[in-house]
């Protein structure tokens, strides 16, 4: 994928919606996503990889319960500490954490593995507009900012975006957003869920 390796952007399907993204390790590509989506600079972009081993090079899994790791690949995003100097600063929150998941979608996973890097996976829509479930739903202005649209593989399921949790040192998990994986299902798995003042905030 020469385009992605050179800092370009693609629109591609994920398990939930179409995403617009590029290499999460390339500051120029990250900036282009913000510009294309007219996204607030204070909202970090989520990141996805084709396998957990690839993510393990860049984030710290120390406090992640095994039961959550068994949900990967899947629509579960975890806010984890990033290793220093790896990701562009715009992908990090104030505590140096990044929102990551392992995507089960074969196209998105193959792209990540092909460039040997995580991808930014922000939904393919202008900020505050509806996300795109099909390639035809992608707005023209956003499509023009991408080097291409990959209209192949299984169609995204739509519905809800990924569920977002932040694993904490005491073994519990702060709820950031309930999404495609219901909180009730996670609780039944034994995950200790905590709702705080950050729960429900549109951070990602």
Question: Where are the language model's segments positioned?
Answer:
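Active-site-adjacent structural elements in enzyme catalytic cores
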Residues: 1-204
């Amino acid at each position: 994928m020469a385009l992605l390796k050179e800092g370009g952007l693609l629109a591609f399907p994920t398990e939930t919606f179409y995403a617009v993204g590029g290499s999460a390790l390339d500051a120029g590509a990250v900036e282009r996503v913000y510009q294309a989506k007219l996204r607030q600079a204070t909202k970090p972009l989520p990141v996805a990889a084709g396998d957990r081993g690839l993510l393990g090079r860049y984030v710290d899994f120390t406090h992640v319960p095994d039961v959550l790791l068994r949900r990967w690949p899947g629509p579960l995003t975890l806010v984890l500490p990033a290793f220093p100097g790896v990701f562009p600063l715009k992908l990090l929150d104030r505590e140096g954490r990044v929102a990551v998941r392992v995507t089960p979608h074969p196209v998105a996973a193959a792209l990540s593995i092909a460039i040997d890097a995580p991808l930014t996976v922000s939904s393919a829509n202008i900020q505050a507009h509806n996300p795109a479930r099909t390639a035809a739903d992608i707005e023209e202005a956003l499509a023009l900012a991408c080097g291409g649209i990959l209209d192949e593989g299984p169609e995204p399921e739509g519905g809800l975006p990924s569920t977002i949790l932040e694993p904490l040192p005491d073994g519990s998990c702060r709820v950031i957003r309930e999404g495609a994986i219901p909180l009730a299902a996670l609780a039944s798995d034994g995950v200790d869920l905590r709702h705080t003042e950050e729960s429900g905030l549109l951070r990602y």
